């Protein structure tokens, strides 16, 4: 069978794409390497809560149930994605890993561990969270030091007794630092000045105000969009700020090297560590795409709002694909609708 559209990835981006594809009489399939819908959310750390409230944490066509000003947990989102799939009867093939994507004439050939698929169009919705981005010098740490990427961290029971350094100043690193500060000596290493924003202003989520002010939907090419994009993300909430003030979490500068049980920082200081949590984000890996002009020599994608120079090939779920909201649950629906209209 030759599908009209093959979607690669059944996370929030792929499911949002599926919602719109259901609006047309198109044959399509959503392929995902996972064994369950919502699996990647379930695997995140136990205490994870979104920094967007329920009112800004749903996909097109189905609201996230519950008090709309409350911040949902990771398990709520996982369950929501399962319900979303069932509500719209989306055709998903799980346990399917794409090993190669090629184009022959006017058809795309998707080679997978489950056999070959063919499609007239392909939407790559694997998102940005593909491979943990851990610096090479981490290999210089002793095997006695426990190292975890933030995607592997679940709770404090995984850690060994002693000092913990969390590397990375995003919201995940901030949440983990606050959580661990109640149990052990914690250092937080960041390469930029931290900025903090309240989660709520006047009993409304700050994202409600972002929306009203045009910040949430600021186009990536606008002056506002470029200003926000080129600055580190703020930390939402003031828990970490309080912990830094009372020294429950000790702030360190950027980690530059490691040796045995020591981490070295760019201010010349060092810390003897027992645990390191690399909250350093992810990097993309598109080596499986065997189509010229899509990925450059540095691994960057060639696209405009997810539309590539290759007819019929699209991307979805990228940070700043069109706006600040592109990386968020609610925002991905806007990008999915745009791609849908290009088909």
Name each model feature, range by range:
Residues 1-34, 38-40, 69-171, 175-343:
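Flavin (primarily FAD) cofactor-binding/catalytic cores of flavoenzymes
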């Amino acid at each position: 069978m030759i599908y009209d559209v093959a979607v690669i990835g059944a996370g929030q981006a792929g499911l949002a794409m599926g919602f719109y594809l259901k609006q047309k009489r198109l044959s399509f399939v959503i392929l995902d390497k996972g064994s369950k819908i919502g699996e990647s959310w379930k695997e995140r750390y136990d205490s994870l809560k979104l920094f967007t409230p329920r009112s800004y944490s749903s996909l097109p066509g189905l609201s996230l149930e519950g008090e709309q000003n409350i911040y949902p947990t990771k398990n709520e989102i996982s369950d929501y994605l399962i319900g979303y799939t069932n509500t719209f009867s989306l055709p998903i093939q799980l346990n399917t890993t794409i090993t190669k994507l090629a184009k022959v004439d006017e058809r795309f050939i998707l080679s997978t561990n489950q056999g070959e698929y063919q499609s007239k169009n392909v939407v790559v919705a694997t998102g940005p969270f593909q491979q943990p981005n851990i610096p090479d010098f981490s290999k210089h740490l002793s095997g006695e030091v426990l190292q975890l990427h933030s995607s592997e961290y679940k709770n404090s029971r995984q850690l060994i007794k002693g000092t913990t350094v969390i590397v990375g100043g995003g919201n995940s690193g901030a949440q983990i630092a606050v959580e661990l500060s109640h149990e052990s000596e914690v250092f937080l290493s960041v390469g930029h000045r931290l900025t903090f924003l309240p989660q709520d202003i006047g009993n409304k989520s700050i994202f409600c105000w972002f929306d009203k002010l045009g910040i949430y939907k600021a186009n990536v090419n606008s002056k506002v969009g470029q200003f926000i994009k080129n600055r580190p993300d703020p930390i939402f909430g003031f828990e970490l700020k309080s912990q830094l003030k009372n020294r429950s979490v000790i702030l360190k500068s950027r980690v530059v090297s490691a040796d045995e049980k020591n981490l070295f920082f760019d201010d010349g200081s060092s810390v003897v560590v027992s645990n390191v949590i690399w909250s350093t984000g992810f990097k993309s890996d598109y080596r499986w795409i065997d189509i010229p002009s899509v990925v450059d020599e540095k691994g960057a994608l060639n696209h405009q709002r997810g539309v590539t120079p290759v007819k019929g090939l699209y991307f979805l779920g990228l940070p700043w694909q069109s706006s600040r909201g592109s990386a968020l649950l609610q925002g991905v629906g806007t990008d999915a609708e745009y791609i849908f209209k290009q088909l």
